[in-house]
Amino acid sequence: MPPANPYSKYIKQYQTNNINTATPEKLMIMLFDGAIQFLQKAKIAIAEKNVQERSLNIDGARKIIRELMRTIDLENGNDVSKGLFRLYNRMSMNLIKANVQRNSDKVDEVIEDLTNIRWGFQKAIEIQSGVTTLEEAMKEQQAGEENEHQFPPIVENGGNNAE
């Protein structure tokens, strides 16, 4: 068993402070990043045939997706809200299949969906705060469709990917 990280207490405190001081918008981005990181680790576990790590990481991502589902106001929402809820539900079902079938392709599908939704939320935040314009975001989206998505890196020992 590897020795405990002597900084783990401080890392945990840093993460807690980040969560406690984050805006609701930043918390949403953090949820997407967390789910994507869980799924990247699940893919590694699938490749290594590590049942425990696969299940643990897929379950972590599913918990985050359920939390994202809870943020949707279906009673007062529009078709976009309902569509997003169905998409999250499909992702959750795909992760169940991925876990049972040890299928990394299903995990990749969910990573791609989460990455696309995260990008949309990030751009909406940037537009709302005046960091970018809708036109700039649309140009970036068109350029991004020509390239592969860049996923947040996996960080060991509970690290934080603060932007």
Q: Model-found features: residue ranges?
A:
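Secondary-structure capping and boundary motifs in well-ordered enzyme cores
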Residues: 80-84
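Generic structural concept
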Residues: 29-36, 55-62, 85-92, 108-118
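N-terminal leader/targeting segments and the first structural element of proteins
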Residues: 2-79
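Charged low-complexity stretches with an acidic bias
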Residues: 67-72, 86, 141-142
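Short terminal interaction segments
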Residues: 2-18, 111-163
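Hydrophobic recognition helices of helix-based DNA-binding modules
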Residues: 65-68, 95, 121
